[in-house]
Structure formats: structure tokens, C-alpha cells
Amino acid sequence: DRDSCVDKSRCAKYGYYQQCEICCKKAGHRGGTCEFFKCKCKV
């Protein structure tokens, strides 16, 4: 789910969010972005 993406998809310092994006999409969201090194899913 959405919260597990935050734990699983740590974001690199310079905005590498491929894992975050994939995790969020699998959880049924439109994608994800990185904020403060954490993955945030778009609704």
C-alpha cells in the first residue's frame, strides 16, 4: 500500500525516484515523487 512505498523506496539525494514511481503505481496510485528523501505517492 501507499505507506509501504515510503519504507521500501528511499529516494536518493538528487531525485532518483524510479523505484518510488513503480512502487506507487503498483499500489494503485498515479505515480510518486520524492520529498525529503522519502517516497510520496500521488493519489
Swiss-Prot record:
The presence of a 'disulfide through disulfide knot' structurally defines this protein as a knottin. Expressed by the venom gland. InterPro entries: Ergtoxin, Scorpion_toxin-like_sf. One of its GO terms (molecular function) is potassium channel inhibitor activity. Belongs to the ergtoxin family. Gamma-KTx 3 subfamily. GO terms for cellular component: extracellular region. This is Potassium channel toxin gamma-KTx 3.2. It holds the Pfam family Toxin_17. Keywords: Disulfide bond, Ion channel impairing toxin, Knottin, Neurotoxin, Potassium channel impairing toxin, Secreted, Toxin, Voltage-gated potassium channel impairing toxin. Its main location: secreted. Blocks Kv11/ERG potassium channels.
